[in-house]
């Protein structure tokens, strides 16, 4: 698919080189510190990018597996964070090569809003599979108010899903979208927030989800 190749090329151009001392965490995960502290299973950081969240989990003493579709991102993770259990390069559309019920936490920070609806549900099913019963998924996704980062721009392929000028897919969520896509989890927290990691203000939905225990 052209979108997959375009996405890979784009992110490899972004994740060129990082130095650990310049990698910063922001405070969005602090809300979940009690959950993080009590987590005994490994943590999966999907779409790890430069390693902002990987760093946060490492500093909390967690066993982290970091993943990204960009080989440059993974090379930087391996260079900057030798503490990680593993750093794996794969596209989420290919599925997740992990055992069932393996992770206590999955972190998807700005990495789940690049897919068509059917693919998004497939990825979320994979995340539920690899989470332990009662495990947690921490998410941030684009808001429909995220105009500084392309909200409403490009060709609309599905409601709130756009094909951008560089040939990538980009989805923007309202609260109804957020609750619909994540309805197979228990939604513990869902709030529209502003984040300031980048040069311009970004608007996101921050969501805390819990995998349901069967039976």
What residue ranges belong to the model's regions?
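Class I (Rossmann-like) S-adenosyl-L-methionine-dependent methyltransferase catalytic domain
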Residues: 1-40, 49-85, 89-95, 138-215
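Conserved beta-strand/loop positions that form the S-adenosyl-L-methionine
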Residues: 46
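A short acidic, Gly/Pro-enriched loop at the edge of an enzyme's catalytic core
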Residues: 96-106
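GHKL-family ATP-binding catalytic core of two-component histidine kinases
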Residues: 97-99, 116, 174
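A short SAM/SAH-binding and catalytic strip from SAM-dependent methyltransferases
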Residues: 104-119
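Intrinsic-disorder/low-complexity, polar/charged segments enriched in Ser/Thr/Lys/Arg/Asp/Glu/Gln
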Residues: 112, 134-136
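A short glycine-rich, Lys/Arg-flanked "PGG" loop and its adjoining helix->strand segment in the class I
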Residues: 121-133
């Amino acid at each position: 698919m052209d979108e997959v190749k375009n996405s890979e090329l784009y992110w490899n151009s972004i994740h060129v080189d990082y130095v650990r001392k310049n990698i910063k965490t922001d405070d969005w995960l602090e809300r979940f510190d009690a959950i993080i502290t009590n987590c005994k299973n490994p943590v999966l950081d999907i779409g790890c990018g430069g390693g902002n969240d990987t760093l946060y989990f490492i500093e909390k003493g967690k066993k982290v597996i970091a993943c990204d579709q960009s080989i440059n991102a993974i090379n930087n993770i391996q260079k900057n964070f030798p503490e990680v259990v593993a750093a794996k390069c794969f596209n989420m559309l290919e599925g997740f090569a992990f055992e069932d019920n393996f992770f206590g936490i999955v972190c998807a920070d700005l990495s789940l809003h690049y897919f068509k609806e059917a693919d998004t549900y497939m990825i979320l099913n994979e995340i539920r599979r690899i989470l332990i019963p009662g495990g947690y998924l921490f998410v941030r996704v684009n808001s429909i108010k995220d105009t500084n980062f392309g909200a409403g721009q490009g060709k609309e392929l599905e409601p709130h899903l756009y094909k951008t000028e560089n040939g990538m897919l980009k989805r923007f969520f309202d609260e109804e979208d957020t609750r619909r896509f994540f309805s197979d989890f228990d939604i513990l927290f869902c709030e529209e927030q502003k984040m300031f990691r980048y040069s311009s203000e970004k608007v996101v939905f921050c969501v805390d989800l819990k995998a349901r225990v069967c039976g």
